[in-house]
Design a protein with these regions (language model features):
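Active-site loop/oxyanion-hole signature of alpha/beta-hydrolase fold enzymes
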Residues: 22, 36-76, 251-252
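Flexible "cap/lid" loop of the alpha/beta hydrolase fold
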Residues: 90, 98-132
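Conserved HGGG/HGGXW glycine-rich cap/lid loop of the alpha/beta-hydrolase fold
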Residues: 1-44
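Catalytic active-site module of serine/aspartate enzymes centered on a nucleophile-bearing elbow/loop
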Residues: 228-258
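Conserved loop-alpha-helix segment in the C-terminal half of the alpha/beta-hydrolase fold
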Residues: 200-238
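Conserved alpha/beta-hydrolase "nucleophile elbow" surrounding the catalytic nucleophile
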Residues: 10, 77-82
């Protein structure tokens, strides 16, 4: 597209990828240069045996803006990945313009650090055959469909089949390293307390919350308590993917904010 850059960053659910922005990226491209990034270890990006921590993603996002976009950019980010963008912006605020956060994850959950149980979980998932078997149970066709029905779709009877397929496919791409991102996230190695970062950044921040998102209202309140300049809007009849379930209303909010 043409116009000011806008960077889209997907959630970190097992099988997450830039595919989730498919329903809005063409419309965004009418007024912006759109960059749809698959984060390291996700989607079509390379999957490797490294420990995926918050810092790895902060670095990847900053490098992408510096080397590919080459100027200050607006960002739309979904779910858990909000934590990466907040920290990246806190570290290098000259790279970021406005930030739209879609259903950000709760601040309290990000404060949880790996304990003995989590370290054991990660070790188990790293065992070659056993770990891969467990991971394949987590991202089996039934498990992915159930996640959508229970946690992501507003209407459990009509989840977005194409998105489900994309999640299933991306979760299985990358051979034995496909499980790595999941192993590090499930064992809390990706967590980082973003409270200070959120408090100290003075960029325009806008939360878009799905009406039925679990704990949505409480999460928005917590973000506003830390940084009172945060604005928020709720999109009716949506849950975890408002940009998939109600693309028109979502684009309307993008138009208002950017």
């Amino acid at each position: 597209g043409k116009g000011s850059p806008i960077l889209l960053i997907h959630d970190m659910l097992p099988g997450g990828s830039g595919y989730e922005w498919g329903k809005i990226e063409d419309d965004l491209a009418l007024e912006h240069t759109v960059y749809n990034l698959d984060l390291p270890g996700c989607g079509r990006s390379e999957k490797s045996g490294i420990t995926y921590t918050n810092f790895v993603y902060v670095q990847a996002i900053c490098d992408f803006i510096k080397n590919v976009i080459g100027k200050k950019t607006d960002v739309i980010v979904n779910g858990y990945a909000v934590s990466f963008v907040v920290m990246a912006c806190h570290n290098e605020k000259d790279l970021f313009n406005k930030i739209m956060m879609v259903n950000p994850v709760s601040l309290s959950s990000l404060k949880q650090m790996p304990g003995k149980k989590e370290k054991l979980l990660r070790r188990c998932l790293e065992i070659p055959v056993f770990g891969t078997l467990v991971y394949h149970m987590v991202v089996s066709r039934d498990a992915v469909n159930n996640e959508f029905i229970e946690n992501y779709a507003f209407d459990p009877f009509h989840p977005d089949r194409d998105l489900q397929d994309a999640y299933y496919e991306a979760a299985h791409r990358g051979g034995c390293y496909a499980k790595n991102v999941y192993a590090n996230k499930a064992s809390k190695y990706m967590n980082i307390d973003i409270t200070r970062g959120l408090k100290e950044i003075d960029n325009s921040l806008y939360i878009v919350e799905g009406e039925a998102e679990n704990n949505g209202e409480a999460i928005v309140e917590a973000y506003k308590n830390v940084n009172p300049s945060v604005e928020a809007v709720m999109i009716k009849e949506t849950k975890h993917f408002p940009h998939v379930e109600a693309p028109e209303q979502f684009l309307e909010q993008v138009g208002i904010f950017f």
